[in-house]
Design a protein with these regions (language model features):
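Transmembrane beta-strand segments that form the barrel wall of outer-membrane beta-barrel proteins
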Residues: 110-119, 213, 266-273, 363-364, ...
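Outer-membrane beta-barrel proteins
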Residues: 38, 84-88, 129, 140, ...
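Detector for outer-membrane/organellar transmembrane beta-barrel domains
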Residues: 250, 258-397
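Outer-membrane beta-barrel translocator domains and adjoining extracellular loop/strand segments
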Residues: 61-66, 122-132, 163-170, 218-236, ...
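Transmembrane beta-barrel outer-membrane domains
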Residues: 41-43, 87-93, 129-136, 186-190, ...
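Outer-membrane beta-barrel "beta-signal"
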Residues: 399, 435-450
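Cleavable N-terminal export/targeting peptides
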Residues: 1-30
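Outer membrane beta-barrel
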Residues: 32-68, 78-225, 244-257, 297-312, ...
Length: 450
């Protein structure tokens, strides 16, 4: 039998332990994170995102451009590249991004930095180490207060068609479901530094104007006057070509809701400035490029989206994935803008919760502008120049299937794309086919971070 003193001591210890537990405050319940990769620092949320690709690319001709397809230089079937198939396995298209969001009084701030690995790399990149260089895709910040937004940084151009509103976020921009890093012919797009101002007078209407980085693009297919310095324009390898002022882009969007579906309609314009100088006459020449765009994303059923977009321009070819020149230079160094039109139509259908099928048809049409520099023909589309395209067309079909998709684990996707591309020059040498064609197959297994 335990002694009375020992029993009293045991009871006192138990009471002391109960009192201590009663005085210890219970830990406050923490809200579950919106994503396993969300980190809260101060009053800002840092979300790490992106995906990892294991991609196979097969082309019926040797385009020679790596993961992105250079549509404007598809080789002819009477050349060696036109008779050689291309096979490539790569993970260059993998992406990493960081999204930061915060509240600042009555305003909200968010910023995004995104990189992939399609930057310029060494010539022997595929020999041993496959050390692909990272590059900045997007890097912007947005300040929103009330009915107004301000965006600054490198973002999708305002001229690119939106799916809803005028948001710079990639899911709100029509970029297609394609795996090709050059997306889809007929789409208008660029990622460039800008200062964008957007107003939302109502839930269904948005209007914006953007001041964006310019670049006077002529490409390699425009023949310049013999005495004209190539450094005054971008011939595909002159990033420092001068521009008199930024590109000015405006857009209005209308997003009505019809039952459970939403529609999107928009109209946009672009104004661009070009300038050249002639040392022979000590004169400066100027020209203005313009373009008008109309786009729609129609949802006839909740699981189906119909997409249509077009850009009609006189001096806006750079925005057509660089497939068309902005202008040509005359013998006296004056400027003649070149007309070009792009258009794309497509359908995206979620046939099952885990499976989407998609298809697009896109085209780019480019006008011919030719002059003479003494006895030499100059401009775009001169006789016997197979690099000056009259039209380029692309038909695409594909499927996107999710093996699983869960916020805690991310998603594992199988995506396949088949495309047929045809380019038709204004003129070809004797014995050369009238057009060049290639077939593209892209297949990737993609893990999307949670």
């Amino acid at each position: 039998m335990p002694s009375p003193i020992r029993l009293i001591f045991t009871e006192l210890c138990a009471l002391s332990s109960s009192a201590a537990l009663a005085q210890t405050p219970a830990a406050a319940p923490q809200p579950p994170p919106t994503s396993p990769l969300t980190i809260r620092i101060g009053d800002a949320d840092f979300l790490i995102g992106g995906f990892l690709d294991a991609m196979a690319i097969v082309r019926s001709t040797n385009v020679g451009s790596g993961a992105p397809t250079t549509f404007s230089t598809i080789p002819f079937e009477n050349t060696a590249p036109g008779n050689l198939h291309e096979t490539r396995l790569t993970s260059q298209t993998s992406r990493v991004n960081l999204l930061v969001t915060a509240k600042v009084g009555a305003a909200s701030v968010r910023s995004l930095l995104e990189i992939d690995f399609l930057g310029g790399g060494p010539g022997n990149a595929f020999v041993t180490a496959n050390s692909h260089a990272p590059r900045m895709r997007l890097g912007w910040a947005e300040y929103s207060r009330g009915k107004f937004d301000f965006i600054g940084g490198q973002a999708w151009t305002l001229l690119a068609p939106n799916r809803s509103g005028l948001s710079p976020v990639t899911p709100d921009v029509v970029t297609s479901q394609n795996l090709d890093a050059n997306l889809q012919l007929g789409l208008v797009w660029a990622r460039q530094t800008q200062f964008r101002f957007v107003a939302h007078p109502s839930k269904t209407i948005a209007a914006g104007v953007s001041i964006e980085n310019p670049q006077p693009f002529v490409g390699g297919a425009v023949v310049l006057p013999e005495s004209f310095p190539e450094s005054e324009v971008d011939n595909g390898g002159t990033p420092g070509a001068p521009s008199p002022y930024p590109d000015i882009i405006g857009k209005v969007a209308f997003d009505p809701q019809t039952g459970e579906t939403r529609q999107h309609f928009e109209a946009a314009f672009v104004v661009r400035g070009f300038r050249t100088y002639s040392s022979a006459s000590d004169r400066t020449f100027s020209a203005t490029g313009t373009g008008f765009s109309f786009s729609a994303v129609i949802q006839p059923a909740k699981s189906v989206h119909l997409i249509g977009t077009t850009l009609i321009s006189d001096g806006g070819g750079r925005y057509m994935i660089g497939q068309a020149p902005d202008f040509m230079v005359n013998a006296d160094a004056s400027i003649t803008t070149i007309g070009s039109t792009s258009a794309m139509g497509g359908v995206e259908a979620q046939v099952k919760p885990s499976t989407m099928i998609f298809g697009y048809y896109g085209t780019v049409r480019i006008d011919r502008e030719v002059a003479s520099d003494g006895s030499q023909a100059i401009g775009y589309g001169i006789a016997g120049a197979p690099g000056a395209n009259r039209s380029i067309d692309e038909m695409t079909v594909g499927v996107n299937h999710a093996f699983f998709r869960e916020p805690r684990y991310g998603a594992m996707l199988l995506i396949m794309q088949y495309s047929h591309v045809k380019r038709t020059p204004w003129s070809v040498p004797d014995g050369t086919p009238a057009s060049a064609r290639t077939n593209l197959v892209y297949v990737t297994v993609r893990y999307v971070l949670p």
